């Protein structure tokens, strides 16, 4: 596999966390340390899932493949509905939820957005792609897209307020549906 293809796979893999970061960046009170914490946790979750896929190809592929899409779907729908519910409960307030406020929320989002990395780890391992190069590409894209997502979301958040949070919840549910439909096709 050529480097360009690997970079495109890494970029595609990072789009889920970009969408979450974009929607969550609308919180005007989010600090750079919170963004850094989210970015590092997103990278760590992607690397763990990618490594599980890479090194556990024969064991995990057979046992986990049957329901990984259901786990991703369930987590993303749960988080998406929760974001929409919290936004609707604000009754006109212009503050977005800080996904970094609680570690459990951030961890759930990191795990939900990294499920695809398991399948990518399996695929790239079977394709014979270099592990360190794959890890470097994925880490780079997840880190950069998370930071840019939060920053762009921060610029749009002043104008969008609660609408951005509702949109973020809808985006998560859309990603969940896409994961489920892709798995069923």
Swiss-Prot record:
Give the GO cellular component terms, alphabetically. plasma membrane
Localization terms from the record: Cell inner membrane
* Stated name of the protein: Putative manganese efflux pump MntP
- What is the protein's membrane topology class? Multi-pass membrane protein
Question: Which family is this protein grouped under?
Answer: Belongs to the MntP (TC 9.B.29) family.
Against InterPro entries, the record matches this protein to: Mntp/YtaF, Put_MntP
Q: Which UniProt keywords apply?
A: Cell inner membrane, Cell membrane, Ion transport, Manganese, Membrane, Transmembrane, Transmembrane helix, Transport
> What's one GO MF term for it?
manganese ion transmembrane transporter activity
Per the entry, what this protein does is:
Probably functions as a manganese efflux pump.
Is the keyword Ribosomal protein in the record? no
Q: Mind telling me which residue stretches traverse the membrane in this protein? A: 3-23, 40-60, 64-84, 102-122, 124-144, 165-185
